[in-house]
Design a protein with these regions (language model features):
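Post-Walker A helix-loop "phosphate-sensing" segment adjacent to the P-loop in P-loop NTPases
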Residues: 462-472, 487
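Conserved lysine of the Walker
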Residues: 453
């Protein structure tokens, strides 16, 4: 009996027809994760293992050697090796870590950190200040699929060859997360969980069946693939370039030469896969060459055959002394819509086909279902007839294949995200001067006028202040006065305040070595006083007299008497000499002359109030301090002495530095301290800076000087080399004298790296560039900030004047910055309250 007589209901046949479909999951390779093998079992009975590497900005020698070592490993027959770079728009982990580091509970600091993170997060779809280049994280994956289990020995060989590229095994959940994002939406994170064990007696579905979600479209239409609310296109080379160079390969994923090539960047997420097959023998190469050479052809077919003959000829040149592999390069771009995907594909095609050494590139359509899976880990099925029918592979020597590998992306810095920059290709750069892998935390900055130095350093000081560091800046010119005000810091004008800077204050020295170092510095300071007007060198006898006088002053507890105590010892020499051997009759007039030369620095002298009595410069409780020396430039006899005393006093504080609250010392405009005339000796002044670098290295502080040219280090004499050796990081901004610095053996750059350095530019007001050379990497970074942070960091005279005018008109510093940046102060305070609530 029918439930509805006479009504034709849904039949099983119609029901089955409604649910029958082609499942793209059938193309995906992964069946199950086998924990014992740390590998995926794949649909073709292969075993897949994956790693993540740290991509390099450029093809440095150690990178190419690592790749050559990898490609020369004797893998089993039928092995497929894939190197895959993914321009990942998901930068939230780095931004979250950046915010977690900004622990100082100050409304302005927290607002700047939040707005920086939001600005860069929004930049994943393109930053206007960078000509719409998106901010991203280039990730590099290595996938190896073998017909037999890879085994511990081969796995160890792979990891040893790539150790210098930061290789790590990729957990299965991370790889599955990447797969899910490709198919379901690259802009959002995806879970990595998957079923691997049977439940309720039912076997777990294959991993391939757990990747693609039911909701988003998955449709192949001509040259487009609609997947995960995004549109993808694929490009492959129809013919390779006649030859490949490292620089040419670098440009396959975007220009690297600066603003002139900003339009040569792929404006969204993309994936570049180089699949390497190890099955083709040299016999097959020679056989194909003979067939092609014997062909007679005309018209367009002749052109095609000619290109293939040229390709084979290039290969045969290497055949006698190099291993050969087959490679399949594929480039996928992912747009938010068809228009963006089309524009991205056109730009990628232009990059590959540009001179010199152009490739012939085609957009794929019919083969898209196969090529999509083949461009993902383990998704290329190396059955010989299939590869032959696919016709997308090229044979080349492993040296050429290593250059084609997508390992050159962009400079990425290194360490925790204490500082955030953006690379020329959009890489989010993280940098930490206090990274534990670096053997010292010191730095040098070099920048000619107008290169963006003050903005860069204001930003650097603000970022470290935000994470709890103590900031000490010695400056000439007031570049940090506004920042000091905004950070509720202490601004000390040395020429205006009646401070006592007693060079014999040894209270912070922690051990005998520190005390002797402090005494040696005090001797250099007093020697500078004794020759203040001439800056001439002192003789060995003069040095030893001063050293004996200062040792007596300290040992006898007369340190608070300052220069008066030294003059007393010198004037009565040899009465207080330590032994008969220290009494030299002909040095009596020398000692009295030294005492006479120090008269201006005694308590009754013109400058005596600076150096006699207990020290009153106590900044140990201050979080942010600027010591301004501008007023003293008009007193040349005093200027160098004050510089030495101030540098010495500030760097002695490094004895108190701690890992959780490091001290950060910056000496700006150091070259102005080192002005020199014929016959003058600047070694004593240079030694003050050298001591700063040594103390910072010993006590895990950070000490840095700012120069207008790296050649200024020659003014420091032998101490210049000490500074270079004790400064792990260099910030080199736009300059015109780097060639000369190389000639002077100050910089050890040549060729490509030197050209890269000389390409650094300040593109104000959009961004400024800086060449960073650190133990964690070398390359060019761009400082680009949101409007609110811009007004915190700027030191341009007209913009500082606008800020000061608002403060004089009654705004507090935070309100002044908000008004200039067009931000409601209530938003800043409300945001800070919300953050405080979360912290609670």
């Amino acid at each position: 009996m029918s439930a509805r007589p006479g009504h034709k209901g849904l039949s099983y046949q119609r029901l089955r027809a409604a649910v029958t479909r082609d499942a793209y999951s059938d193309f995906l390779p992964m069946v199950a994760w086998v924990e014992e093998e740390e590998a995926f079992l794949c649909i073709d009975d292969g075993w897949g293992q994956a790693w993540e590497l740290v991509p390099s900005a450029y093809m440095f020698a150690h990178v190419q050697q690592a790749l050559l070592g990898l490609l020369n490993i004797h893998f089993p027959e039928g092995t497929v090796l894939q190197l895959i770079t993914f321009a990942d728009p998901l930068i939230d982990p780095a931004l979250d870590a950046y915010l977690d580091m900004k622990v100082r509970p100050d409304p302005l600091v927290q607002a700047s950190a939040r707005r920086t993170a939001d600005y860069l997060r929004g930049g994943t779809r393109g930053l206007d200040a960078l000509h719409a280049i998106p901010v991203r994280d280039f990730r590099l994956f290595l996938a190896i699929k073998t017909r037999v289990k890879l085994g511990a020995d081969l796995r160890r060989q792979v990891e040893e060859q790539l150790a210098k590229m930061g290789i790590r095994r990729l957990p299965p959940d991370e790889l599955i997360s990447v797969y899910r994002r490709i198919f379901n939406g690259v802009f959002a994170p995806a879970p990595g969980v998957f079923l691997s064990e049977s439940m309720g007696g039912m076997p777990a579905p294959s991993i391939a069946r757990q990747i693609i979600e039911a909701g988003p479209d998955l449709c192949f239409e001509g040259p487009e693939v609609f997947l995960g609310n995004q549109v993808a296109r694929c490009l492959t080379p129809k013919a390779p370039a006649r030859r490949i160079t490292a620089e040419r390969a670098n440009r396959l994923m975007g220009g690297m030469r600066g603003s002139a090539e900003d339009s040569d960047q792929i404006g969204g997420p993309f994936l570049y896969c180089l699949s390497v097959l190890f099955d083709h023998s040299q016999f097959e190469i020679h056989k194909r060459a003979q067939i092609l050479s014997a062909q007679k052809a005309a018209g367009s077919f002749a052109v095609e055959v000619g290109k293939q003959i040229e390709e084979i000829g290039w290969i045969l040149d290497e055949a006698s002394n190099s291993r050969f592999v087959s490679v399949i390069p594929t480039m996928w771009v992912f747009g938010r819509d068809s228009a963006q995907a089309r524009e991205m594909a056109a730009r990628a095609k232009r990059l590959w086909e540009s001179e010199p050494l152009p490739f012939m590139v085609q957009e794929e359509s019919y083969l898209l279902p196969v090529l999509l899976a083949a461009s993902l880990p383990f998704g290329l099925y190396p059955e010989k007839q299939t590869i032959k029918l696919l016709e997308r592979d090229f044979r080349m020597a492993v040296k050429a294949a290593s250059l084609m590998a997508p390992v050159q992306t962009d400079f990425r810095g290194g360490g925790r995200p204490a500082l955030l920059y953006v690379g020329r290709k959009g890489q989010l750069i993280t940098l930490d001067l206090f990274d534990p892998r670096i053997n010292n935390y010191n730095f040098i900055v070099s920048a000619e006028s107008g290169a963006g130095k003050s903005f860069l350093l204001n930003n650097l000081c603000q970022q470290y202040y935000a994470q709890g560091a103590l900031i000490r800046i010695i400056d000439i010119g007031g570049s940090y006065r506004k920042l000091c005000t905004l950070c509720s810091g202490r601004y000390i004008d040395i020429g205006e305040e009646r401070l006592v800077l007693n060079p014999f204050d040894m209270g912070l020295a922690l051990d005998g070595e520190d005390k002797q170092s402090a005494i040696a510095m005090a001797v250099a300071i007093v020697a500078e006083m004794a020759n203040a007007s001439t800056r001439k060198p002192v003789t060995t006898s003069e040095w030893n007299l001063l050293k004996s006088a200062i040792q007596w002053t300290v040992d006898s507890g007369r340190g608070d008497d300052g220069i008066d105590a030294v003059r007393h010892w010198l004037g009565r020499y040899p009465d207080n000499a330590a032994s008969d051997l220290d009494r030299v009759d002909h040095l009596v007039p020398v000692a009295r002359e030294l005492a006479f030369n120090l008269r201006d620095f005694g308590s009754q002298g013109a400058y005596g109030h600076f150096f006699n009595g207990p020290s009153t410069l106590d900044i140990s409780r201050d979080e942010f301090v600027v010591l301004e020396l501008e007023r003293l430039k008009a007193l040349p006899d005093l200027f160098n002495v004050i510089v030495m005393v101030v540098v010495n006093a500030v760097t002695q504080e490094l004895y108190l530095s701690a890992r959780d609250k490091p001290r950060f010392v910056l000496c700006d405009e150091a070259a102005q301290f080192m002005t020199r005339s014929d016959g003058q000796d600047l070694s004593r002044l240079a030694e003050a800076f050298g001591q700063g670098y040594r103390r910072a290295r010993k006590y895990q502080g950070s000490f840095g000087i700012v120069l207008q040219s790296m050649n200024d280090l020659m003014l420091f004499g032998g101490t210049g080399q000490v500074i270079l050796e004790n400064a792990a990081t260099k910030f080199l901004l736009q300059g015109s004298t780097y060639d000369k610095a190389v000639d002077n053996k100050i910089l050890d750059y040549s060729g490509f790296v030197l050209d890269l350095l000389k390409s650094v530019r300040n593109a104000k007001p959009n961004y400024s560039e800086v060449f960073i050379d650190s133990p964690l990497g070398l390359g060019i970074a761009r400082l680009v900030v949101d409007p609110f942070s811009y007004w915190i960091n700027t030191s341009a005279p007209n913009e500082v004047a606008a800020f000061e005018a608002l403060v004089r008109a009654g705004r507090n510093p935070l309100e002044a910055v908000c008004e200039l940046a067009g931000v409601d102060p209530a938003q800043i305070l409300a945001g800070n309250c919300r953050q405080g609530g979360r912290a609670a």
